[in-house]
């Protein structure tokens, strides 16, 4: 029987496909090693279909995840490590944190020497001094009283992606000639910190090379955005960054107390232990006020000899503060200097609606889209829970599905539960409040990565209130 023209063409295609076919050994290798990115052909109901390779493998979460869990009914500040124990030693998510110089378009100019940054130009002429982190996956889950935090390099089911982002290595200053928020080591007048007090330049209380303060959250946001006109990628410190840094610390050190004594030794199992130390939190209020009126005093980049590392470095206060030469320890977490203490940090992407009255609520709204950050309403924000109405040491946090670190209940202590203090007050009428994190140089044990204050409107300024610089390439 003669074939039709269409049938002949199909036969030719079959012969051509057979002739051009390759053996399995002749196929090129895949470009990655993540099984969640690969597809394979399967036969189902007599038909060929595609399937994610990961769904076909006995690929266990326990193999590629590490994290912590805690029983929120237990007062201990220590948490339990879970997941792959080898990952708790190698810390693959944490080791993605590294110092770099970032230009105003968000391009990495260079990565800094992981052991010591002091050999690099950090004065702003080659870019902002930032710490890169992200590009991993996380999951926050609750089962009865158990709260879990999980990290992975793989997109496991139920995990959400943490995009690449950048946070300033230092508490931010302002380039005075351009009103650009900056992360630099620069002692010229153009980067004078504090409230730009030129008459202090030759005094021991100089703010040259120090962080900028006496700025509202509103203006911190504006100054950050000045780095690139028309873009919302440059920001002051954001809640998402603060929150993730807190959980990175907790998973690494298996404690909720960031002020645990610093310890260079590993545990017998090879894990990190201890914390970041007191930080710059042990000044006397009256002496600090007399010395410089609560303005910052630690120079930006003071701990840069530690590179991408974690540690602390002693700083001696001027004798004008105290004739006894008071000493404080400046802490550093994976390249981030003074992650708490010294000065409070204004944080964007979080607004709290505090209602008056004993039966009112303090409603917490968060936003991961910088284009929607604002200080006047909650449009584009999500309600994630309610803040504690009283001040005190934090006993419980909101947590939820995104690991919220806003206090939900007080009643803890300086060495129990979260070990950090919660500050707030109840207004006479409904008010929108911003959130400050970290505490400052006189807070002592009250300070820390989870220390939070919702006492002020975003327009508030003070000598001891600063922020950091962030670059968010994409929304979370």
Segment roles from a protein language model:
Residues 32-44, 335-337:
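Short hydrophobic/aromatic-rich beta-strand motifs
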Residues 353-368:
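A short, polar/charged loop-to-alpha-helix boundary motif
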């Amino acid at each position: 029987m003669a074939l039709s023209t269409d049938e002949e063409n199909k036969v030719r295609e079959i012969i051509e496909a057979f002739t051009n076919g390759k053996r399995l050994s002749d196929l090129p290798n895949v470009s990655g090693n993540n099984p969640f990115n690969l597809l394979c052909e399967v036969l189902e109901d007599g038909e060929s279909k595609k399937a994610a390779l990961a769904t076909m493998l006995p690929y266990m979460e326990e193999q590629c995840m590490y994290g912590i869990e805690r029983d929120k009914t237990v007062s201990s500040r220590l948490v339990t490590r879970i997941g792959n124990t080898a990952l708790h030693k190698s810390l693959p998510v944490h080791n993605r944190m590294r110092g770099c110089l970032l230009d105003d378009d968000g391009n990495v100019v260079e990565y800094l020497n992981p052991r010591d940054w002091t050999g690099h130009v950090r004065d702003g002429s080659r870019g902002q001094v930032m710490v890169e982190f992200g590009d991993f996956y996380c999951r926050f889950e609750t089962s009865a009283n158990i709260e879990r935090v999980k990290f992975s390099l793989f997109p496991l089911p139920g995990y959400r992606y943490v995009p690449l982002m950048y946070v300033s290595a230092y508490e931010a200053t302002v380039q005075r000639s351009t009103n650009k928020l900056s992360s630099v080591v620069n002692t010229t007048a153009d980067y004078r910190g504090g409230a730009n007090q030129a008459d202090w330049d030759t005094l021991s209380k100089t703010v040259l090379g120090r962080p900028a303060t006496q700025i509202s959250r509103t203006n911190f946001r504006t100054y950050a955005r000045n780095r690139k006109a028309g873009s919302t990628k440059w920001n002051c410190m954001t809640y998402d960054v603060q929150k993730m840094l807190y959980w990175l610390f907790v998973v690494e050190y298996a404690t909720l107390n960031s002020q645990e004594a610093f310890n260079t030794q590993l545990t017998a199992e090879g894990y990190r232990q201890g914390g970041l130390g007191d930080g710059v939190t042990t000044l006397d209020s009256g002496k600090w006020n007399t010395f410089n009126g609560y303005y910052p005093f630690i120079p930006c980049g003071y701990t840069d000899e530690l590179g991408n590392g974690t540690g602390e470095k002693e700083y001696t206060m001027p004798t004008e503060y105290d004739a006894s030469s008071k000493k404080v320890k400046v802490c550093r977490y994976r390249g981030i200097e003074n992650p708490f203490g010294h000065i409070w940090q204004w944080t964007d992407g979080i607004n709290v609606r505090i209602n008056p009255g004993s039966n009112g609520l303090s409603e917490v709204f968060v936003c991961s889209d910088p284009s929607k950050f604002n200080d006047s309403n909650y449009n584009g924000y999500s309600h994630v829970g309610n803040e504690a109405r009283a001040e005190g040491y934090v006993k419980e946090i909101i947590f939820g599905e995104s690991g919220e670190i806003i206090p939900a209940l007080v009643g803890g202590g300086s060495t129990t539960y979260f070990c950090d203090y919660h500050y707030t007050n109840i207004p006479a009428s409904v008010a929108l409040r911003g959130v400050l994190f970290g505490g400052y140089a006189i807070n002592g044990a009250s300070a820390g990565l989870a220390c939070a204050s919702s006492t002020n409107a975003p327009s508030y300024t003070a000598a001891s209130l600063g922020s950091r610089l962030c670059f968010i390439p994409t929304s979370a």
